[in-house]
Amino acid sequence: MRLFRIPLLAMGLFFSVSFNLHANTVLADNIHSSAIALRDKKSALSKSTTIDLKELIADPKKYDFFTFRPNLEKLILSGAADTQHISILWYTIPNGSVGLHYHSMTESVYTIDGTQTDAKGVYPTGSLYFNPPESGHKITNSTGFFILAYASPPDFSNTDKIKPYTPVQINTADPDLEKNYTFTYSQAGVKVYDVPLDPKGGMSSKIIKSTSLIRYKYLGNYLLVLKGSCNINGKVFDKDMLVVAKTIETQSYSLSATAGDSCLALGLSF
């Protein structure tokens, strides 16, 4: 028996050391992963602007709007007016208007509060629409606030290039939104509707519904909470909160539901 005692002890010591090394490696990997996750959370939000749209509507003069057209103010959130950009438009009078203009790339419009009208329809609060590349329109009878995203700026000179088009329209306030549009499961507890946009238009968009506390990763330029309460990169945002990248560079956002509430959000990406 003595002949086997030393090897067995040595073997036990070997397994003990190996187990400890493995455990320490796993622990170090977990700490490293947690540190990376925390860094990414802080990084995305530090590179983003957060806007409470209710506060903006209540007191728009607190923000750095500039005059875009007569009786029409614009707040640039990312990018620049003469390039692709995300902005908020504010009609300062009832029945505001914008002259005919051309969109060489996709345009996105979300009605924060009010109504926008063009030849294709009337878009009340909660409406989302996308005009495809080579489209164009004239705005009439419009008032309120709107989130705009342009893959290229509106062109008021080359209106002869406008071709027949059909906008993609979504009523985000529709109580049957999830029934009327094809949401597919991306992961457990997360359903996504990919808005059918022309891939040549330089823009993509998703509507994300989460009932899970497990994070869904979204690479994009903004997230708008449409309903419920969303945890975005470790911070809770309620309805009408907008998180938008400060530049046109996309950011890695993580999104989940919060305890006791679901999350419905609109994501847009260049």
In which residue ranges do the predicted regions lie?
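Short histidine-centered beta-strand/loop micro-motifs
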Residues: I88-W90, V98-H103, K120-G121, T140-N141, ...
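Glycine- and acidic-residue-biased ligand/ion/polar-headgroup-sensing regions
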Residues: I93-P94, H103-D118, T211-N233
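A short, N-terminal "cap"/entry segment at the start of jelly-roll beta-barrel domains
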Residues: N24-Q84, F156-S204
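A short hydrophobic beta-strand segment most commonly corresponding to one strand
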Residues: T143-K161, T258-F270
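Classical Sec-dependent N-terminal signal peptides that target proteins to the secretory pathway
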Residues: M1-T25
